[in-house]
Regions:
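Extracellular and organelle-lumenal recognition/adhesion modules and their flexible linkers in secreted
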Residues: 3-263
């Protein structure tokens, strides 16, 4: 068996070693700049915590419904849904956020809207360096299962500067699937560095023509209803429809890493 004996490993143009080896016991230390701990900015992304209650029925409008904590259901004129913390989940997870249609709406009004969102404080999203020349990309990853196949819209909304960016993902079967959406960096409009709401991550389920009449805004720009949820399937068109979400993760950069489980 061959072996290589070294004291350290250093890049060709580097001044410091990337890996330093202890010659006595063979252990090593590494100079790591992309620390993988505390990278997920979403709170309760695994949907494990539901302190207010595990289920809320008869929902017809915006509210922080019982079910997994930190998530708000927004919208109106979508029919009626039940929200709950479900045990239906992909491998590696125990819970999910479930939306179940109990009164269908197959004929949406122009202002019909149903979305799930979590909002983040400005002091917690400073790593994106938004509004500077060093602005970073946003890597959003999540698991979704739905009995309603079709195109769904996810959005990042900057509350401080009234800006947004949107992307779509396609549910093509009724199984659990992991999705990764990489949103561009934004050199315009910095997030306020305080404990107020600065960034919301939104998942659309229903959208009337007031939100779908333009072209989907896939680059950062001024927030506008008409370009915010274009192509969104009508999840509320049947009482057979269910939508589940878990493993939600938002991190800095162009690569979505494995979900960061926290106790």
């Amino acid at each position: 068996m061959s072996e290589i004996k070294v004291n350290s490993i250093k890049g060709v143009g580097a001044s410091a070693a990337a890996i330093t080896v202890n010659n006595t016991d063979g252990t090593c230390t590494a100079n790591i700049t992309n620390n993988l701990s505390n990278r997920n900015l979403i709170i309760n992304g695994a949907m494990q915590v539901a302190q207010r209650g595990t289920s809320d029925s008869g929902i017809t409008g915006s509210q922080y419904a019982d079910g997994p904590d930190r998530y708000k259901l927004g919208g109106s004129s979508f029919g009626t849904v039940t929200v709950s913390q479900s045990t239906d989940s992909p491998d590696g997870f125990s819970n999910s956020y479930k939306v179940d249609v109990t009164t269908a709406n197959g004929s949406l009004s122009a202002g019909s809207l149903l979305e799930i969102q979590q909002s983040l404080e400005g002091q917690n999203v400073q790593a994106f360096a938004k509004g500077t020349s060093a602005a970073k990309q946003y890597a959003l990853s999540f698991y979704v299962k739905s009995t309603k196949t079709g195109t769904y819209v996810a959005m990042l909304l900057d509350h401080d500067n009234n800006r947004m960016v949107c992307k779509t993902y396609t549910v093509s079967d009724t199984n659990w699937n992991r999705y990764t959406l990489i949103f561009p960096a934004d050199t315009t409009g910095a997030f306020d560095n305080n404990n107020e709401k600065s960034l919301s991550v939104k998942f659309a389920l229903v959208a009337g023509t007031s939100f779908t009449s333009g072209t989907l805004q896939t680059t950062w720009g001024t927030s506008a209803n008409a370009t915010s949820r274009v192509g969104q399937v009508n999840f509320a068109d049947s009482t057979s429809n269910e939508w589940y979400l878990t493993g939600l993760q938002l991190e800095v950069g162009s690569v979505a890493t494995d979900f960061e489980h926290r106790s």
